[in-house]
């Protein structure tokens, strides 16, 4: 069932003969899913050392992005106390 839903999510209908627009839409869907990166990475053999380095970098980047998003969400809250009352 899950593979079927993924297939439907990546199906793009060509409307009014606009093949270029459908192709752009398909590329955007594949890029957001991360498939283009996986395909280009599997095109050539990746040495185990480079794979560990890449996975470590991706883990650090993911943690950094999550923490940054948490901080930004905290700053964007509307109902928090104003730190500069007299200004």
Swiss-Prot record:
NCBIfam families: S21p. The gene is Mrps21. It comes from the Eukaryota. It is found in: Mitochondrion. Pfam families: Ribosomal_S21. This is Small ribosomal subunit protein bS21m. GO terms for molecular function: structural constituent of ribosome. The lineage of its organism: Eukaryota, Metazoa, Chordata, Craniata, Vertebrata. GO terms for biological process: mitochondrial translation. The keyword Thylakoid does not apply. GO terms for cellular component: mitochondrial inner membrane; mitochondrial small ribosomal subunit; mitochondrion. The keyword Mitochondrion applies. Belongs to the bacterial ribosomal protein bS21 family. Component of the mitochondrial ribosome small subunit (28S) which comprises a 12S rRNA and about 30 distinct proteins. Keywords: Mitochondrion, Ribonucleoprotein, Ribosomal protein.
């Amino acid at each position: 069932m899950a593979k079927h839903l993924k297939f439907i999510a990546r199906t793009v209908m060509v409307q009014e003969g606009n093949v270029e627009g459908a192709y752009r839409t398909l590329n955007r869907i594949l890029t957001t899913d991360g498939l283009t990166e996986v395909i280009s990475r599997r095109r050539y053999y990746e040495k185990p050392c480079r794979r560990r380095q890449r996975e470590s970098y991706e883990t650090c980047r993911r943690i950094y992005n999550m923490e940054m998003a948490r901080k930004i969400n905290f700053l964007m809250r509307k109902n928090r106390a104003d730190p500069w009352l007299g200004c």
